[in-house]
UniProtKB/Swiss-Prot annotation:
The lineage of its organism: Eukaryota, Metazoa, Chordata, Craniata, Vertebrata. The chain crosses the membrane at residues 33-53, 77-98, 113-133, 178-198, 226-246, 288-308, 320-340, 347-367. Heme b b566 binds at residues 97, 196. This is Cytochrome b. Binds 2 heme b groups non-covalently. Heme b b562 binds at residues 83, 182. A ubiquinone binds at residue 201. The cytochrome bc1 complex contains 11 subunits: 3 respiratory subunits (MT-CYB, CYC1 and UQCRFS1), 2 core proteins (UQCRC1 and UQCRC2) and 6 low-molecular weight proteins (UQCRH/QCR6, UQCRB/QCR7, UQCRQ/QCR8, UQCR10/QCR9, UQCR11/QCR10 and a cleavage product of UQCRFS1). This cytochrome bc1 complex then forms a dimer. It is found in: Mitochondrion inner membrane.
Amino acid sequence: MTNIRKTHPLLKIINSSFVDLPAPSSLSSWWNFGPFLGVCLGVQILTGLFLAMHYTSDTATAFNSVTHICRDVNYGWLLRYLHANGASMFFICLYLHVGRGLYYGSYTYSETWNIGILLLFAVMATAFMGYVLPWGQMSFWGATVITNLLSAIPYIGTDLVQWIWGGFSVDKATLTRFFAFHFLLPFIVTALVMVHLLFLHETGSNNPTGIPSDPDMIPFHPYYTIKDILGFLVMLTALATLVLFSPDLLGDPDNYIPANPLMTPPHIKPEWYFLFAYAILRSIPNKLGGVLALVMSILILAIVPILHMSKQRSMMFRPFSQCLFWLLVAVLFTLTWIGGQPVEHPYIIIGQTASVLYFLIILFLMPMISLVENYLLKW
């Protein structure tokens, strides 16, 4: 008799995706971050759902409703800090996942990669709108500064900003619509994740060597399910440690001050996971130029497959490319640090240098060094 998991219309979809899925035998721990992201998304949707039951999206009561959640709701403080720090964990896993794709050449699966870029934009939009909801000082001014960037778009910019605001400034209408979109977007993200997996399972997974692994496949269960469960435990332990011991470590103290349109905070900055892009934005003196650089800092990922010049897929056997990759990582850390610093000497010039290096490495140095490696290998 055939096993029910192979015949039942619903179970066979799960079976072909998570049980009998043929997977390369050499997948390292870097392949754990995809499943981690799935867990993060689940945690965010669940905690967010319970938070939404107690939150009010009105400028008069939003800040107090968050305080009420933390003080009066059963385990409300836990929900709130799991949600806030869960977002940080989400972005850590997201950036490591993208980094893994860059290092091992996973971007050659163009459909999966492009859906991944869409996912990155959707998650960033969700996180930005979520940061506005507590209606603290940094929420309000962050929303004002970032939405105002759209005014740099020629001709329609000002109208577009006022249309998004629902008025002439960030106010009640803005908060209400941001809450609506913040609630809706994670479900769109979930749908995109399914499409991402659909395309991934069409081609099969890449592996660290970058060499086709068709002759050497193993079933996903039990090998990778056990490996993922161990990873989940490590990740959730790290998240629990952060939430229970220092929940405000990654937050901004200014967000514990209720939003005041008449008083600007000394340093307006987004959450840490946007600081690298914020640093690139600030490093260009022209407003439109800064906005274009900001968008391109993420959108540049879409042209990475076109810039792949190496005869090898992965960087595993390409030491020069590895050096450049880790230089890129160092540049991103530098940009993240600069994004949190005030706009003054020497931070301005460091930020500008790091921004130029970021684009230079991806657009020119990586393809050039790949051609050099091809030549050295006589390929």
